[in-house]
Amino acid sequence: MKDFIFEPINTNTIQKCHELNEKNVPNVGSRSLKGLTNSLENSDYSECILFRDQVVGFVICFLDNEITKSYMEQIDHKNFREISNRVSNFLYIDRIAVDIEYRNKKLGSQLYSNIVDFSKNNSITSLTAEINLLPSINISSFEFHKKFNFYEIDTVKYSEDYEVSLQKKEIN
């Protein structure tokens, strides 16, 4: 882990985060570079993992507050809306990705540990996320989130080819 650098996403790393995001579709939703940059600019927590100046992982999160709700309404973010109708005082993990060559090295776990620390320091009581069921079920994400004591609070089917599992973890 000592060779990996964890730092906030910035203008120098957003392009590489976007490339990594697109390599992980359909496990994460596709976003344009402009859309991902817009998310970053409106996010409350972001972090990327660098290894030899290469982005090998990242996460972008949003707090449950009026500014975020307004932004999410503007971009019609259905998953955030569904979670905010069911949970309060949460940090929403909008997207996380780790390069396939760097998986099983505890990098995603370290990102989540950092998110938990941020949440505790900001009196946040829950972490939330969604996991794709359709167009393809993201089994590795279910297994990963289960290790962090996430549980399903509901499923939402938006169309014949898009369904998600809404997930929650209590912060102690």
Task: Report residues per predicted region.
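A short beta-loop-alpha structural element at the N-terminal edge
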Residues: 2-19
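Active-site rim helix/loop that mediates acceptor-substrate recognition in acyltransferases
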Residues: 26-52, 60
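Conserved acyl-donor/pantetheine-binding loop and adjacent beta-alpha core of acyl/acetyltransferases
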Residues: 60-95
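Conserved GNAT acetyl-CoA-binding A-motif
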Residues: 91, 119-135
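A short, internal acetyl-CoA/4′-phosphopantetheine-binding micro-motif in the GNAT/acyltransferase core
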Residues: 94-103, 133
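Conserved acetyl-CoA-binding loop-helix of GNAT-fold acetyltransferases
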Residues: 98, 104-119, 147
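Conserved active-site alpha-helix within GNAT-family acetyltransferase domains
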Residues: 121, 133-154
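C-terminal "cap" of GNAT-fold acetyltransferases
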Residues: 154-172
